[in-house]
Amino acid sequence: MSKVLTSLPAGERVGIAFSGGLDTSVAVAWMRDKGAVPCTYTADIGQYDEPDIASVPSRASAYGAEITRLVDCRAALVEEGLAALACGAFHIRSGGRPYFNTTPLGRAVTGTLLVRAMLEDGVQIWGDGSTFKGNDIERFYRYGLLANPHLRIYKPWLDADFVTELGGRKEMSEWLLAHGLPYRDSTEKAYSTDANIWGATHEAKTLEHLDTGIETVDPIMGVRFWDPSVEIATEDVTVGFEQGRPVSINGKEFASAVDLVMEANAIGGRHGLGMSDQIENRIIEAKSRGIYEAPGMALLHIVYERLVNAIHNEDTLAAYHNEGRRLGRLMYEGRWLDPQALMIRESLQRWVGTAVTGEVTLRLRRGEDYSILDTTGPAFSYHPDKLSMERTEDSAFGPVDRIGQLTMRNLDIADSRARLEQYVGLGLVGTPHPTPIGAAQAAATGLIGAMDEGGAEAIASRGEATDEETMLDRAAMESGTD
């Protein structure tokens, strides 16, 4: 049975994740006008694009909301972000620069805590600003149902009646004015921005075009480090970790993890650290592009991985990177609380993170330009005294030991040579193999045939769309498409 409502449930309470922007404001007013009972829930996630988050719920009252609540999600979001950091749960990277999954982290927390707040008020229907082409519609759906199995979903922007009447910013603003309701006429930006305490996402509109670069974005957590007119002074910073958690910055301990992250953001931000331009694969396997900021997470990540490399052996590092990447994709898909994710997360936090204790000093310059000045810790596996190229009093092994070790390698080298000789005899090396294998085998059995041009386009095309589908597709939502 579908949990998604396609028409307004008149007479019932509907919870709306309320941002105070044009789209959610008009949605609340329209639902009240049409007979539903809107209740708004605003998440305080430390978002840098809303400096006065405390005032947002009061705005909802003016549009007819029966319940207006501000839910403080910052502590939970910081904790989940620290867990992701300890696990290296970041799977998207370009040119060595990672995306720190800051939006998926935020959705896991808000999608859970807002629905729980609604449940306390007896609200069983939930709506948010995610569009049907993006990731968030599925993330919120999964987390919402995990928090409340009886939840039903209503999104005005998937309701043909709503979109017919209020399909774009112009129609929305005119509707509010016609009904005597306040309208904050903010300037429409060339791209959409979504932020929380861990980072900011810039996407959609002009940024969908790959000939538009990162330099068109105005950072909200950092500075335009690419602009030579922006003065950025060199700065040294020391970050301390204990058992996989950051505990100090420049020797200072903080009253809460939230305060520590805010300080890390401030330091990384004034250097433009942690900005990246990514092409990624959405949940639905369509590619999208985003420009991301995460100055504090980037700073902590540099320090954490420096310590991880100093402490753990090669196989542990391989597991950390491989499983961390898998966990990052699960989080991206809205599966951060699924059993398979919890299993990976617990293993990495327990066997990788808890051993990570130490301090790293960095010299920050512009953007990703930094130097590591010092690395200290009580349990490093790095022992230069044992492997020095100079004469040492107590080396780990001597030349005769190494000769013996090399001799023991003869067996596996011989095995490798034997396999290569066998492959030559079979025609796998040096000559075409007489028996088709791989794609050639599939072609020989008829599973892969002629591939005429244009087939991929035919598969991806939706065909002739109905008027209603076209209208929903063109609905202009200022929240973007993530």
From Swiss-Prot:
Subcellular location(s) per record: Cytoplasm
Region named Disordered: 461-482
Keyword Transferase belongs to the record: no
Similarity annotation: Belongs to the argininosuccinate synthase family. Type 2 subfamily.
EC number assigned by the record: 6.3.4.5
Highest taxon of the lineage: Bacteria
GO cellular component, one term: cytoplasm
Binding site for ATP: A17, F18, S19, G20, G21, L22, D23, T24, S25, A43, G129, T131, D136, D194
Keyword Amino-acid biosynthesis: yes
Keywords of this entry: Amino-acid biosynthesis, Arginine biosynthesis, ATP-binding, Cytoplasm, Ligase, Nucleotide-binding
Catalytic reactions of this protein: L-citrulline + L-aspartate + ATP = 2-(N(omega)-L-arginino)succinate + AMP + diphosphate + H(+)
Gene3D superfamilies: 1.10.287.400, Argininosuccinate synthetase, chain A, domain 2, HUPs
A UniProt-annotated Pfam family: Arginosuc_syn_C
Positions with a binding annotation for L-aspartate: T131, N135, D136
Assembly and binders: Homotetramer.
Xref: HAMAP family: Arg_succ_synth_type2 (MF_00581)
CDD domains: ASS
Record protein name field: Argininosuccinate synthase
